[in-house]
Amino acid sequence: MTQGAVKTTGKRSRAVSAKKKAILSAALDTFSQFGFHGTRLEQIAELAGVSKTNLLYYFPSKEALYIAVLRQILDIWLAPLKAFREDFAPLAAIKEYIRLKLEVSRDYPQASRLFCMEMLAGAPLLMDELTGDLKALIDEKSALIAGWVKSGKLAPIDPQHLIFMIWASTQHYADFAPQVEAVTGATLRDEVFFNQTVENVQRIIIEGIRPR
């Protein structure tokens, strides 16, 4: 392959990547506002600046696009948990995980709300992911946390309930943002409130799992 051909291929690859990114971003905005059934592909295509035909070239159906968006959300959420290793200092690792989850709630509130909508609907289009890769990851990290408990590095808690509690307390600030703002007058976009939230959620959870 000539140098010119390589450059052309590289440009084409970047263009495809940028177009997919624009479609996924537009899909997240639209699905989180109207839900799966209330969204039309024409809306997403218009927001992404592509034709419907072009959209369907990359994502063959509305369902395929919706699942791609949800998988992208899961990848963002689960990356910090995937990084957990047995040699980590447990309290420091969990404390940092809480911060990262709150950063996700701050930076991707629409993603959190869309995922919540899917769960409330019974996860009809995401159940394979939940019972497959997600469950496998939670089983793996629960065993790791159980090892920390057994070695006395954490208080005697159930690992799955700890993970659920972290998810619930951090995602609340995205899923129920209007309620949080109505009560406190602030959102996670407010730097002072964000730091207060991180410190309080960390303290409440960490003090509950600190070995006595």
UniProtKB/Swiss-Prot annotation:
Keyword Transcription recorded: yes
Quaternary structure, from the entry: Homodimer.
One protein family per Pfam: TetR_N
Swiss-Prot/TrEMBL GO biological process terms: negative regulation of DNA-templated transcription; positive regulation of DNA-templated transcription; regulation of DNA-templated transcription
Additional notes on this entry: The Rut pathway degrades exogenous pyrimidines as the sole nitrogen source at room temperature but not at 37 degrees Celsius, a restriction that is apparently a consequence of an inadequate ability to remove toxic malonic semialdehyde at the higher temperature (RutE/YdfG function).
InterPro entries: Homeodomain-like_sf (IPR009057), HTH-type_TetR-like_transc_reg (IPR050109), HTH_TetR (IPR001647), Tet_transcr_reg_TetR-rel_C_sf (IPR036271), Tscrpt_reg_pyr_util_RutR (IPR019915), Tscrpt_reg_YcdC_C (IPR013573)
HTH tetR-type domain: residues covered: 17-77
Name this protein carries in UniProt: HTH-type transcriptional regulator RutR
Keyword Ligase: no
Function: Master transcription regulator which represses the degradation of pyrimidines (rutABCDEFG) and purines (gcl operon) for maintenance of metabolic balance between pyrimidines and purines. It also regulates the synthesis of pyrimidine nucleotides and arginine from glutamine (carAB) and the supply of glutamate (gadABWX).
Start-end of DNA-binding region: 39-58
